[in-house]
Amino acid sequence: MPSDNFIDKAFSAMSDVVMKVIPTDQKSKDAFKYYRSGMAAQVDGNYAKALGNYTEALALEEDPFDKSYILYNMGLIFANNGDHEKALDYYHQSLELNPNLVQALYNTGVILHYKGEQAEEAAELDEAERFFDLAADFWKRAIKIAPNNYSEVQNWLKTTGRVGVG
């Protein structure tokens, strides 16, 4: 998409200016460069390259808030590749550093809900309910932070009677 390309180029140009203007050490600048390269590779679908860049960024980054976004993006890659356990691990790590990272809360709920659906299909109803309840807990935390988002989730919580649970 041309508009996405324009946005990426504008973001890169602004990032370069910010990194030159704001006083920061070389390690932080390098971490940000790896993070930015990881984002570009992720957008292009080159997940191996993205993970490599994110790993380098994670090793250099000292700010817990920034680390949370690196970990979150790594989780996205694993989720996109169907490795839900690794995705959950990275989402949990990101939430340990940034408990209000609403995207990680939401995506954790998505994976847990999916696991609930799988358990339901396998007629493991107690296990399904456990996963659905866990998904509801994460989604309610996300909705508390962003109450105007996730209308489908809010409807699911209401229709399943999980609005007040947890």
UniProtKB/Swiss-Prot annotation:
Q: Which PROSITE patterns match?
A: TPR, TPR_REGION
Position of the signal peptide = none
Q: Tell me the keywords, alphabetical order.
A: Membrane, Photosynthesis, Repeat, Thylakoid, TPR repeat
**Membrane-spanning intervals of the chain:** none
Pfam families under this entry? TPR_1
One GO cellular component this record assigns the protein to is: plasma membrane-derived thylakoid membrane
- Main subcellular location of this protein, as a coarse class: membrane
Q: Where are the TPR repeats?
A: 31-64, 68-101, 116-149
In the record, biological process GO terms are: photosynthesis
Q: Which InterPro entries match?
A: PSI_Ycf3_assembly, TPR-like_helical_dom_sf, TPR_rpt, Ycf3/AcsC/BcsC/TPR_MFPF
* Compartments, record wording: Cellular thylakoid membrane
The record's comment on protein family reads: Belongs to the Ycf3 family.
Q: Which PANTHER family match?
A: CELLULOSE SYNTHASE OPERON PROTEIN C, TPR REPEAT-CONTAINING PROTEIN MJ0263
What role does this protein play?
Essential for the assembly of the photosystem I (PSI) complex. May act as a chaperone-like factor to guide the assembly of the PSI subunits.
**UniProt-recorded name of the protein:** Photosystem I assembly protein Ycf3
Name the source organism.
Acaryochloris marina (strain MBIC 11017)
Give the gene that encodes this protein: ycf3
